[in-house]
């Protein structure tokens, strides 16, 4: 075969594979086969000097550009007017209704009833791609002023989900948002000398980096949502436009909703607000746009905004505030960790006063100092984290000092990797109290009525220094505790006695092995079936267990090497604790060996009971949807997991369909 022809075929084939992998999330070729064809193409291009502009080899280069050139957009990239309340959306909607009624009353050709299309408002950097009459990507540009942007074509080509060639013979400009996913952000920060402050800065900084190789390291993604300019037949509706974007192979978010009433819009706002922190990327609101293009054209624009669309903005999930102090706290493992004390700031609808700082390495890497203005980010409803400092605020600030002794008990501290630990395991109150509380917890020994307040009193007044001491408690001594009468004392003793008969997985979890949670404990018990077998397990045997990696395996081995650990376990057993394992008979079913995700509310099952049912059928129950997911069981109010399953082509079952299958 002619070598040029072979190059053209390889380019077409590799671009098809890239679309399947990066846009559809479902590759039809192995990484090994892809790499083989890719390097075959590299060699052929080198040999012949023949390179197509849309070849995948043209995505990343070592070029460092001298400057950014200007690019004049064919069609303006408008900003959107913003609303933060439903009342503001109502006012906008009423203006649209009034316009429609007046127009239809005076015009021979009526406009259709109002229909709105809702899409997510991505928090990244707006980009405009232009494709020539051959469908080849010729320019990628930033929004800039809306009329003129910066040419970032080389940077845009590093985004692997962006097609370098499309099946379209009209000159085209398409608008989208370059974003950085949480996964890409965390991976980059784990390896970077200077960590990124947030996802948006990560995307914007990458596209505006003259060193294209640096842009590529950030592994950006993109979503497209608008055709700004197109020669040829115009679109009649926004939905028609979105369908065009999808059929041309551009990556799109799968959340697109049609609404005709304010109640429907409110419902969608509430839904997206609920799931926004579960997403793998940042959004800061919803875009609400009129579907009919002719209605849009007649409504027109203000000086700044189109009248036919509005952005509903959520509360900020990132803010700047002042770092007042750093508090050092001791965890169950003895790790001493810093917590930032902040000047109160409103963030994502709550007042934030504290934030995570992780460790001294994290503090140094981010350049955090007392008295500085810091960037604070809140996501997934967890304690906010400090992402970095405002450089201009560093004058007059103080260095954060690492503690020399334990802040709780005054004992000597030791370094292990990037963390510091208090070695006073038995005498350090926070360690012991948290250890006892963990041991007594519902997922562990399930000692009913046990609280942190009780644990504190047992430590302070009854000299409890080990979990085995719980089984030596005496009725008379419990009566000396605050708010402990005869009934409460007896109830606690009864609950402790009852806890002796426990499952092996609960007992294993109760021991507090570092990095071993409830699920891992269950997986370990399934594999080894007894405490004795687990204690003797080799590294190779441990990592063969599903989801047990090197770190977890080493944690388990080190835990059972400790003389004190074995002493505590033996004492618990001698005091009558009886961890038992009953091998469950796994029924033959279509779910045998399959990965299943459950989302939404089921009528006949709680989360625990559906999990137990699936496991009895031989399924692995996962908390997140991926290409490896086999089934998603969707109940009422199914959320983002349902949407992701749909986009990946994962089989979705209703509760009724699930029950019919079993």
From Swiss-Prot:
Keyword Manganese carried by entry: yes
Protein residues bound to NAD(+): 31-35, 79-80, 143, 177, 313
One GO term of the biological process aspect: DNA repair
Pfam family, one: HHH_2
Recorded GO CC terms: cytosol
Residues that hold Zn(2+) according to the record: 406, 409, 422, 428
All residue ranges annotated as the BRCT domain in the record: 586-662
Source organism superkingdom: Bacteria
Reactions performed catalytically: NAD(+) + (deoxyribonucleotide)n-3'-hydroxyl + 5'-phospho-(deoxyribonucleotide)m = (deoxyribonucleotide)n+m + AMP + beta-nicotinamide D-nucleotide
Keywords: DNA damage, DNA repair, DNA replication, Ligase, Magnesium, Manganese, Metal-binding, NAD, Zinc
Active site, per annotation: 121
EC numbers: 6.5.1.2
Listed cofactors: Mg(2+); Mn(2+)
Molecular functions per Gene Ontology: DNA binding; DNA ligase (NAD+) activity; metal ion binding
Signal sequence interval, chain numbering: none
Family: Belongs to the NAD-dependent DNA ligase family. LigA subfamily.
Biological role: DNA ligase that catalyzes the formation of phosphodiester linkages between 5'-phosphoryl and 3'-hydroxyl groups in double-stranded DNA using NAD as a coenzyme and as the energy source for the reaction. It is essential for DNA replication and repair of damaged DNA.
Name the record gives this protein: DNA ligase
Organism: Clostridium perfringens (strain ATCC 13124 / DSM 756 / JCM 1290 / NCIMB 6125 / NCTC 8237 / Type A)
